[in-house]
Curated annotation (Swiss-Prot):
Muscle myosin is a hexameric protein that consists of 2 heavy chain subunits (MHC), 2 alkali light chain subunits (MLC) and 2 regulatory light chain subunits (MLC-2). Interacts with GCSAM. The modification N6,N6,N6-trimethyllysine is found at residue 130. Residues 86-783 form the Myosin motor domain. GO terms for cellular component: cytoplasm; myofibril; myosin filament; myosin II complex; sarcomere. This is Myosin-2. Residues 33-82 form the Myosin N-terminal SH3-like domain. The modification Phosphoserine is found at residues 392, 625, 1093, 1097, 1163, 1238, 1244, 1289, 1293, 1304, 1307, 1496, 1515, 1543, 1555, 1575, 1601, 1715, 1727. One of its GO terms (biological process) is muscle contraction. GO terms for molecular function: actin filament binding; ATP binding; calmodulin binding; microfilament motor activity. The modification Pros-methylhistidine is found at residue 758. Residues 1886-1905 are annotated as: Disordered. Residues 660-682, 762-776 are annotated as: Actin-binding. Pfam families: Myosin_head, Myosin_N, Myosin_tail_1. The gene is MYH2.
Length: 1940
């Protein structure tokens, strides 16, 4: 967490991004009771905060913050997170993760205006409804280059991470911004574009290109200007949002190789074109209309022939016309300038405005109806003239085309009349088409302008699309939007978790696949599969007579009862009607299909389109230049009556799916970043948040699932080499130096040696995987370690400098003592007479000798100087030679490496080719076998097709014959009208009853059965009519009696029907109640699993804290050792100082001796000394310059070496990233190939399923005929069915009571657990006290460490005390750690095993059904992908394999290079240390010279003082001499000089004192810093102690409660699962029986009506019915036997399962006992038990699948036999009917007079029957044509498969040839390798010789330096000897003078 100082870079945005330090400290210190602080469910606010008052009987009493008291169930109370998690930036880090915690975290952050929050891998943003300063330029710069964890959540952080990932990973990126309308998607999209335009500017100056008088901007300006233009034409005011985007867009921003902007393009989706002609009251149309009418540019008003009042134009004035937050005038200026910046020509700009104005005029076109006709005609031509003028059309032609369009009939065009309504609809469709096409053209034109043709490498895509929509009325638009979000959510899940888990398996990590219930494949395939919703919709659009109801019926026939995601909608009062419901991931959505066919076809007037194409307005002609019937870009067409979907007829849904597939392809090729936008309230109030609205959006966006996924898996991973390189610093001793070790082993050793939770990471084959947060912890540890190393290095350096300074101070003190001693001695002897004489004579003796000595010294100095220059020149030459040799050496190494890499690449490529050849041969064999199977299946299908065609032709002939007979009967019926007048009234009543019965039948039957039953009924009527011709006389007498009987039976049937309906409603209600109970139990189970996962995470956190505590103890031990080392160093330095002091004392004695020997000095001696000092200083400066130059060259060499090493490291990192990316792509390609292979295997199964479907259709036809014979028996069975339903409903109620009892039992168990938790809390408090004592011991240890620095005398005793304290602490920590580790391991393993067992049992029943549905639904899609992509995929795989091999080889070579460079670095480091040692020795010598110089200055001062005294004495002695005056004058001058020198010496002394004070200040500052560091460490330790206490309390409470909860939880779940399975079985049986009863009731009514007409034929049909009944009984008996066998097998499996459960428990107990003795074998035993469970479950699943497959095979055989027998029966019945019809024809003449009396009664009924029969025949013919089309398409697919097989064979031949060529290349390369190896050896020898030569040169240089130092020493010795000789000469001279 950043400090307030670090947040200062964000400027005024800082408080809107992150909490301040003060607020964080207050949150940590805030009192909190984890037991009672909860969230509670509340009806109004969804969730509120409260405190628990009491718990009784499964109920909890909670007092809310508002003071209210609520009593709720246990499952409606959720624990609250500690205060430190308040306003947390990443919600995945929360301890308790549930809906109220997420909601209140967002709410509290929103209240503080922190609108961005991380949620796992994605970012959640809440619309603030106000301006916030979080997008300022300083914020952009602050986020640039920051990692995600280094900065607060922000859209800029997401953008910068995407940009950095693109640069580092070399991979395309995408940012997916989703949310509801008004949530802020468009604003965030703008901010993303703003960020990229700011940080990735091209850097070019603005270019002004004059194109038709317009000035274009730079690429950045054009990208930013695209938004105002698109918003003007694509945004509008809605109820929720004043600037709502009514289209989706995907903006791709392309970058060059350097990361600069290169180009951009935009793709749009689902423009809401209906808004052009219709708006709701609170909304308005697109902004451009109101901008034009704002009169900001009056020339537009004149040009477009419009007014400034929007109410004059109905198309744009149906809602509001102004928006308070939008200034239309200013927006028009922005739009107009955007058009100019984007490079539109003036002509194009005028065209845009004209077409917009024409759309406005279209709304004013009026038409009226002609008198006495339905034909429409124009009502005035003024508006049409304006619209035609703007579009450059003829108004008369336009009106004619609208009112009298030309329609193609056959090969000719016919003029068709239109009604007013049709013309009005056509005008609206044209307006919408013109606007939509213009919008899409503008987007394409913008893309053309943004494509700068610059080189581009990668792109970042920004997706702004509408979120999931659930309204009261949902139409086709909502289905498209929801389907898009379904695909995006599946992409999100696939990216976040499916790919993650697949990578775990590839990497060899032990992982159990976790299904989070978010698999959306079933819903997606239901919508887009070949027989899905979109497919059926497009098929219906092909038929001219199709209606919305026929579309609905087809949906029900295809999916109802077959797909779990397709349901009938529930009827809710007050809501619009819904026709079907889909189960989406965000909820159940009811859809209304009214008008879907018209919306999908989107018809246009062909004649008007033809006029548009010929328009003089080029833009309009270009928009409609595609085809006469539409444009694929506009996603519509006007071709009517087409039966096949071709290029000229592309529906809205087809275009939408095409665009969506392109979008998903783009997204899959990128690395996605997700942003979820949330709308806080419906009233646009800043700061207010509606809980229910936000929760609904969180569920729709999958926020909670995303967090759970992130926490469950291993979201962080890193390559072993990268991990070793980056984190080796954490424990360098774990990886041995000087020997090679594999990166994986090194990483394992390194992680094992670090104090972290070892369950939080896993080792794969190439990477190490981490749980969420662990990598951040390692980064923190690394930063801390680096900080420690830096502080340790700084401490060493500062200590060294302090010791040097201290040494100087000691030397100064000793020298001061020496000077004081000498001065005192001198003051004692200076008045002695002999000393006065000595002072006078000594200078005279030394002057001559000193001159000679100085001359010799100058000569020697000049010689040494020349030698030094020569040595420097030689050294430079040698260095230049060394540099050239190093360059040559590097070049040779690079050549060798490149050649070696080429050889290795060739070898690996050859190996890969051989492997791929073998794999391809195996795959080709499999493909050929599958192709043969498909050919056989195809042959069988063609034979069946031919049989069906023959049968259909025979049926057509029979139908024709029946139609002829019916026509004859109609003629005879008209002749007998007069004879049946007295019976017409009774027949009319009979007809009414028949109509009522048919209506009731239609209501009870389902859609597909209705059509088939009607056909059968009509055939029965025809049969009865033909037979009735022979029996009309007998029926006349019986009609009246039968009518009465029929009325009675009808009344009985109505009463029975009412009873059945009541029973049905009761059963349905009971079923709904049971389902609700089941859902509640499932939710409880999920919550329990969630609590278990939370407890596991707490245990892991507790372990991590224990490890951190142990780490601190180790750090303290290390600190003690460091202090001991410092004490030893201080002792050594003290001994060294004593030694130096003794040396100085000796030197002082020597100086005193010299002083005694020395005499007075004259002015000439003083001048000579000054000259000598000047020359000495010059020599010293020359020496210092030489040393500085040498150090500068050494530093430059070191810097150059470090830069080269850093560059190589960066190159290695980049190559490793590329390698990682290629490995990822390689694994993905392999997965796709495996999927394709598995899909090819399932094609044959799919065809078998298709055959089964055909057979089932045939069986349904045959079953209808057999059911006709069973109807009498089924009527009697209805009453028994009803009784059975009543008993079953009673059984359900009893089961419901049992469930309620079970729930109460669970609540009692939970109450017992709470009591145990309270006991554990008391124990926890005792442990806290013990822990505080431990913390006190640690503080005392730290205090002892501080005392070590001050108390040197007591160091041994304090050390012993610290060791005792630390050993005690270590033992206690070890005990706690072992205790917690053993308990946690045992309990976590038990929990994991229990969880796995429960998950397997819960999902066992669903996995088989889901797998079968997924396989069947994906067959067609997989087959197409296989045929289209196999060849491309194989090529891609070969390329990626070769690239991966090359990169692997390069990686190995770079590792070798890196090792060599490391070795060289160590060598240079050693040389550097040697040079530093030499520099230090030179520094000490320089220090000695400085001391000598200071001593000479002191001597000079004493000499001057002595000189002064001597001159004073001489002036006293020579008062009587005449030259006394002159002497006095000279002495005064000398005095002034001496005083000046004295002042200079005093100034120097003051400077030395100031420097001493400065050094003392430094020491004080260092001490202050040490104190601050100490206080900071104490504060951090205190904070950690508090965290340890809190987590320890949570851990103990959770661990103890889980042990008691586990057994009860397992028992309750087992009971619930058994009860659930039983209820599901009973429910399925009830549904089957209910459907069966409905079907039988309908068929009974139909049979009753038919039996009255054929009384004499009952005996014949009775015999047939008895035969059919016997067959059915046999079949029923067989089915029952099979069911009994299956039930017995299920019972056996259950028994075995229970037995295995008992054995598992026994094994677990034995395992726990053994683990106490041998902990090393514990993990092996648990893994064996887990594999055993998996194998048992797999065996049971395989057995179940085998039984299902065998059952399906038996059913298929039986259905085939039955179909053959039914076909034979149908043929026999057809022959019989032909015979009877011929017989009836012969008897017609004899019975003609009798028939006329009764024929009139049946007139109306027969007409109705005939009409229905014809319709059914037409439907059957259409169905036959559809089946023929399907068979033809299947044949085409088989032909394509054969072609693909041939392509594979050709490819195999090419590969074999290529392998032979590769072998030859390998032989050539082998020879080349031998030659290169010889060259490498020679180069190595040359390099070694060069290195030896450089070493010799260095040694020579060092030798010269040493000789120079010796020469200087010799010069000093010579100078001292010269001084002695001068003294002696002066003594001799005085003796001679005295003798004279």
């Amino acid at each position: 967490m950043s400090s307030d100082q670090e947040m200062a870079i964000f400027g005024e945005a800082a408080p809107y991004l992150r909490k301040s330090e003060k607020e964080r400290i207050e949150a940590q210190n805030k009192p909190f009771d984890a037991k009672t602080s909860v969230f509670v469910a509340e009806p109004k606010e969804s969730f509120v905060k409260g405190t628990i008052q009491s718990r009784e009987g499964g109920k909890v009493t909670v007092k809310t913050e508002g003071g209210a008291t609520l009593t709720v169930k246990e499952d409606q109370v959720f624990p609250m997170n500690p205060p430190k998690f308040d306003k947390i930036e990443d919600m995945a880090m929360m301890t308790h993760l549930h809906e109220p915690a997420v909601l209140y975290n967002l709410k509290e952050r929103y209240a503080a205006w922190m609108i961005y929050t991380y949620s796992g891998l994605f970012c959640v943003t809440v619309n603030p409804y106000k301006w916030l300063p979080v997008y300022n330029p300083e914020v952009v710069t602050a986020y640039r280059g920051k990692k995600r964890q280094e900065a607060p959540p922000h859209i800029f952080s997401i953008s910068d991470n995407a940009y950095q990932f693109m640069l580092t990973d070399r991979e395309n990126q995408s940012i997916l911004i989703t949310g509801e309308s008004g949530a802020g998607k468009t604003v965030n999209t703008k901010r993303v574009i703003q960020y990229f335009a700011t940080i990735a500017v091209t850097g070019d100056k603005k270019k002004e290109e004059i194109t038709s008088g317009k000035i274009q901007g730079t690429l950045e300006d054009q990208i930013i200007s695209a938004n105002p233009l698109l918003e003007a034409f694509g945004n509008a005011k809605t109820v929720r949002n004043d600037n709502s985007s009514r289209f989706g867009k995907f903006i791709r921003i392309h970058f060059g190789t350097t990361g600069k902007l290169a180009s951009a393009d935009i793709e749009t989706y689902l423009l809401e074109k209906s808004r052009v002609t219709f708006q709701l009251k609170a909304e308005r149309s697109y902004h451009i209309f109101y901008q034009i009418t704002s009169n900001r540019k009056p020339e537009l008003i004149e040009m477009l022939l419009i007014t400034t009042n929007p109410y004059d134009y109905p198309f744009i004035s149906q809602g509001e016309i102004s928006v308070a937050s939008i200034d239309d005038q200013e927006e028009l200026i922005a739009t107009d300038s955007a058009i100019d910046i984007l490079g539109f020509t003036n002509e194009e700009k005028v065209s845009i405005y004209k077409l917009t104005g024409a759309v406005m005029h279209y709304g004013n076109l009026k038409f009226k109806q002609k008198q006495r006709e339905e034909q429409a005609e124009p009502d005035g031509t003024e508006v049409a003239d304006k619209a035609a003028y703007l579009q450059s059309l003829n108004s008369a032609d336009l009106l004619k085309a609208l009112c009298y369009p030309r329609v193609k009939v056959g090969n000719e065009y016919v003029t068709k009349g239109q009604t007013v309504e049709q013309v009005t609809n056509a005008v609206g469709a044209l307006a919408k088409a013109v606007y939509e096409k213009m919008f899409l053209w503008m987007v394409a034109r913008i893309n053309q302008q943004l494509d700068t043709k610059q080189p581009r490498q990668y792109f970042i895509g920004v997706l702004d699309i509408a979120g999931f929509e659930i309204f009261d009325f949902n139409s086709l638009e909502q289905l498209c939007i929801n389907f898009t979000n379904e695909k995006l959510q599946q992409f999100f899940n696939h990216h976040m978790f499916v790919l993650e888990q697949e990578e775990y398996k590839r990497e060899g990590i032990e992982w159990t696949f976790i299904d989070f219930g978010m698999d959306l494949a079933a819903c997606i395939e239901l919508i887009e599969k070949p027989m899905g919703i979109f497919s059926i919709l497009e098929e219906e659009c092909m038929f001219p007579k199709a209606t919305d109801m026929s579309f609905k019926n087809k949906l029900y026939d295809q999916h109802l009862g077959k797909s779990a995601n397709f349901q009938k909608p529930k009827v809710v009062k007050g809501k619009p009607e819904a026709h079907f419901a889909l189960i989406h991931y965000a909820g159940v959505v009811d859809y209304n299909i009214t008008g879907w066919l018209e919306k999908n076809k989107d018809p246009l007037n062909d004649t008007v389109v033809g006029l548009y194409q010929k328009s003089a307005l080029k833009t309009l002609a270009f928009l409609f230049s595609g085809t006469p019937t539409g444009d694929s870009e506009a996603s519509g067409g006007t071709k009517k009556g087409g039966k096949k979907k071709g290029s000229s007829f592309q529906t809205v849904s087809a275009l939408f799916r095409e665009n969506l597939n392109k979008l998903m392809t783009n997204l899959r090729s990128t690395h996605p970043h997700f942003v979820r936008c949330i709308i806080p309230n419906e009233t646009k109030t800043p700061g207010a948040m509606e809980h229910e609205l936000v929760l609904h959006q969180l569920r729709c966006n999958g926020v909670l699932e995303g967090i759970r996924i992130c926490r469950k898996g291993f979201p962080s991973r890193i390559l072993y080499a990268d991990f070793k390189q980056r984190y080796k610093v954490l424990n360098a001793s774990a990886i041995p130096e000087g020997q090679y070790i594999d990166s994986k082993k090194a990483s394992e050793k390194l992680l094992a040696s670090i104090d972290i939770d070892h369950t939080q990471y896993k080792f794969g084959h190439t990477k190490v995987f981490f749980k969420a947060g662990l990598l951040g912890l390692l980064e923190e540890m690394r930063d801390e370690k680096l900080a420690q190393l830096m502080t340790r290095t700084q401490a060493r350096c500062r200590g060294f400098l302090a010791r040097v300074e201290y040494q100087k101070m000691v030397e100064r003190r000793e020298s001061i003592f020496c000077i004081q001693y000498n001065i005192r001695a001198f003051m004692n002897v200076k008045h002695w007479p002999w000393m006065k004489l000595f002072f006078r004579i000594k200078p005279l003796l030394k002057s001559a000798e000193t001159e000679k000595e100085m001359a010799t010294m100058k000569e020697e100095f000049q010689k040494t100087k020349d030698e030094l220059a020569k040595s420097e020149a030689k050294r430079k030459e040698l260095e230049e030679k060394m540099v050239t040799l190093l360059k040559e050496k590097n070049d040779l190494q690079l050549q060798v490496q490149s050649e070696a890499e080429g050889l290795a690449d060739a070898e690996e490529r050859c190996d890969q080719l051989i492997k791929t050849k073998i794999q391809l041969e195996a795959k080709i064999k499999e493909v050929t076998e599958r192709a043969e199977d498909e050919e056989e299946i195809n042959a069988e299908l063609t034979a069946k097709k031919r049989k069906l065609e023959d049968e259909c032709s025979e049926l057509k002939k029979d139908i024709d014959d029946l139609e002829l007979t019916l026509a004859k009967v109609e003629k005879e019926k008209h002749a007998t009208e007069n004879k049946v007048k007295n019976l017409t009234e009774e027949m009319a009543g009979l007809d009414e009853t028949i109509a009522k019965l048919t209506k009731e039948k239609k209501a009870l039957q389902e859609a597909h059965q209705q059509t088939l039953d009607d056909l059968q009924a009509e055939e029965d009527k025809v049969n009865t009519l033909t037979k009735a011709k022979t029996k009309l006389e007998q029926q006349v007498d019986d009609l009246e009696g039968s009518l009465e009987q029929e009325k009675k039976l009808r009344m009985d049937l109505e009463r029975a029907k009412r009873k059945l309906e009541g029973d049905l409603k009761l059963a349905q209600e009971s079923i709904m109640d049971i389902e609700n109970e089941k859902q509640q139990l499932d939710e409880k189970l999920k919550k329990k699993e969630f609590e278990i996962s939370n407890l596991q995470s707490k245990i892991e956190d507790e372990q991590a804290l224990g490890i951190q505590l142990q780490k601190k103890i180790k750090e303290l031990q290390a600190r003690i050792e460091e202090l001991e080392e410092e004490i030893e160093a201080e002792r050594a330095s003290r001994a060294k100082a004593e030694k130096q002091r003794s040396d100085l004392s000796r030197e002082l004695e020597e100086i005193s001796e010299r002083l005694e020997e020395a005499g007075g000095a004259t002015s000439a001696q003083i001048e000579m000394n000054k000259k000598r000092e000047a020359e000495f200083q010059k020599m010293r400066r020359d020496l210092e310059e030489a040393t500085l130059q040498h150090e500068a060259t050494a530093a430059a060499l070191r810097k150059k070496h470090a830069d080269s090493v850093a560059e190589l490291g960066e190159q290695i990192d980049n190559l490793q990233r590329v390698k990682q990316k290629l490995e990822k792509e390689k694994s993905e390609m392999k997965m796709e190939i495996d999927d394709l292979a598995s899909n090819v295997e399932t094609i044959s199964k799919a065809k078998g399923n298709l055959e089964k479907m055909c057979r089932t259709l045939e069986d349904q036809v045959n079953e209808l005929k057999s059911k006709e014979e069973e109807q009498q028996r089924l009527i009697n069975d209805l009453t028994t069915q009803r009784g059975r339903l009543q008993t079953e409903s009673g059984e359900f109620s009893r089961q419901l009571d049992e469930k309620e009892a079970l729930v109460s039992q669970l609540s009692r168990g939970k109450q017992a657990f709470t009591q145990q938790i309270e006991e554990l809390k008391r124990q926890l408090e005792e442990e806290i006290k013990a822990k505080n004592a431990l913390a006190h011991g640690l503080q005392s240890a730290r205090h002892d460490c501080d005392l070590l620095r001050e108390q040197y005398e007591e160091e041994q005793e304090s050390k012993a005390e610290l060791q005792r304290a630390l050993s005690k602490a270590n033992t206690e920590v070890a005990q706690w750690r072992t205790k917690y580790e053993t308990d946690a391991i045992q309990r976590t393993e038990e929990l994991e095993e229990a969880k796995k067992k429960l998950a397997q049992r819960l999902q066992a029943a669903e996995e088989h059904v889901e797998a079968v549905n997924a396989k069947c639904a994906s067959l067609e899609k997989t087959k197409q992908r296989l045929q289209n992509e196999v060849e491309d995929l194989m090529l891609d795989v070969e390329r990626t394999n070769a690239a991966c091999a090359a990169l692997d080889k390069k990686q190995r070579n770079f590792d070798k290079i890196l090792a060599e460079w490391k070795q060289k670095y160590e060598e240079t480091h050693a040389e550097l240390e040697a040079a530093q040692k030499e520099a230090r020795s030179l520094g000490t010598e320089l220090f000695k010279m400085k001391n000598a110089y200071e001593e000479s200055l002191d001597q000079l001062e004493t000499l001057k003082r002595e000189n002064k005294n001597l001159q004073q004495e001489i002036s006293d002695l020579t008062e009587q001499i005449a030259e006394g005056g002159k002497r006095m004058h000279e002495l005064e001058k000398i005095k002034k000089q001496v005083e000046q020198e004295k002042s200079e010496i005093q100034a120097a002394l003051e400077e030395a004192e100031a420097s001493l004070e400065h050094e003392e200040g430094k020491i004080l500052r260092i001490q202050l810093e040490l104190n601050q560091v100490k206080s900071e460490i104490d504060r951090k330790i205190a904070e950690k102690d508090e965290e340890i206490d809190q987590l320890k309390r949570n851990h103990i409470r959770v661990v103890e409660s889980m042990q008691t909860m586990l057994d009860a939880e397992i028992r309750s779940r087992n009971d619930a699962i058994r009860l659930k399975k039983k209820m599901e079985g009973d429910l399925n049986e009830m549904e089957i029986q209910l459907n069966h009863a409905n079907r039988m009731a309908a068929e009974a009514l139909k049979n009753y009506r038919n039996t009255q007409a054929i009384l004499k034929d009952t005996q014949i049909h009775l015999d047939d019915a008895l035969r059919g009944q016997e067959d059915l009984k046999e079949q029923l008996a067989m089915v029952e036997r099979r069911a009994n066998l299956l039930q017995a097998e299920i019972e056996e499996l259950r028994a075995t399962l229970e037995q295995t459960e008992r054995s598992r428990k026994i094994a677990e107990q034995e395992l726990l006992d053994a683990s106490e003795r041998v902990q090393l074998l514990h993990t092996q035993n648990t893994s064996l038990i887990n594999t055993k469970k998996k194998l048992e479950t797999d065996i049971t699943q395989i057995q179940g699948e085998m039984e299902d497959i065998l059952q399906e095979a038996r059913n298929a055989e039986e259905k085939a036999k039955k179909a053959i027998t039914d076909a034979a029966m149908m043929a026999e019945e057809l022959k019989k009917e032909q015979d009877t019809s011929a017989h009836l024809e012969r008897m017609k003449k004899n019975m003609e007079q009798t028939v006329k009396d009764l024929q009139n009664r049946l007139d109306e009924a027969e007409q109705l029957a005939l009409k229905g029969g014809k319709k059914q025949i037409q439907k059957l013919e259409a169905r036959v044509r559809e089946l023929e089309g399907e068979v033809e398409s299947e044949q085409k697919r088989n032909v394509e498969a054969v072609k693909g097989l041939r392509k594979h064979e050709r490819r195999v031949k090419e590969l074999t040839y290529q392998t032979e060529e590769d072998r030859k290349n390998i032989l050539r390369l082998q020879d080349l390798v031998d030659k290169l190896q010889a060259k490498v050896k020679s180069y190595k020898r040359q390099a070694e010789e060069a290195e030896e030569q450089s070493n010799t040169n260095l040694s020579k240089f060092r030798k010269l330096q040493h000789e120079l130092e010796e020469a200087e020493e010799r010069a000093d010795i010579a100078e001292s000897q010269v001084n002695k000789l001068r003294v002696k000469s002066r003594e001799v001279h005085t003796k001679i003078i005295s003798e004279e």
